Structure formats: C-alpha cells, structure tokens
C-alpha cells in the first residue's frame, strides 16, 4: 500500500491567511511560513494583529466558508484516492480546515487544533 501526503494551503486551496488579509484589509496578515519559518513566532504575531483589530475565530471562519478549492483540486484528490491512500498534512487548524474538507470530499487530514 502507498500513502501520498499533500499540503493543504497553496496546493489544494488558496492560502487562508492571504484570503483573510484581503477580506479584512489587513495586509500584514499576508505573511506565511514562507516569510517567517518559526511557526510559533508567526502565530503569536498574527494573534497580536487580530487582537489589535478586534478580530477572532468567527471572522476567520466566515472568510474560510467562502474559500473554494483550487481548480481541479477535488477531482485530483478523487483520482488519487482511487489508487492510493491520500493524507493531507497541514499546519492549519481543524477549526479552519473543516469547511474546506467538506468541499474536497472529506479527505483525511492531519493538523492541529485550537482546543
């Protein structure tokens, strides 16, 4: 048996924080792990910016609900799962990923939780 592992953001769906940055009008939130590889430092920085603007999980989830998979992503996953086990491994949160997983046909995802 083979297992194929994929990232989520930038591979199957657009970058969540970039989408939220565009909707919220806060350009600083465009920063990703490509810009700041220290994940803990990046997340603390993001949380500080969210607090400064009075934003929280509900507003982020509202934006995520409007995000669609990249063109062909669901079809690609469907074909991949016909021949191998496909697992998404991501640094996103369960609370962010759930609506996206529904749109992708509920693939297996390993990620972190805010709980």
Residue ranges and their predicted role:
Residues 2-113:
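Alpha-helical substrate-recognition element adjacent to the catalytic core
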């Amino acid at each position: 048996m083979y297992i194929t592992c994929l990232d989520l953001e930038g591979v199957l769906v657009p970058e969540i924080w970039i989408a939220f940055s565009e909707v919220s009008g806060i350009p600083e939130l465009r920063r990703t792990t490509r810009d700041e590889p220290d994940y803990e430092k990046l997340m603390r920085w993001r949380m500080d910016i969210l607090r400064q603007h009075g934003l929280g999980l509900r507003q982020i989830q509202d934006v995520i609900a409007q995000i669609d998979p990249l063109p062909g992503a669901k079809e690609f996953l469907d074909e991949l799962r016909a021949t191998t086990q496909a697992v998404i491994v991501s640094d996103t949160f369960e609370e962010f990923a759930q609506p996206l997983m529904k749109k992708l046909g509920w693939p297996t995802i390993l990620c972190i939780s805010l709980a």
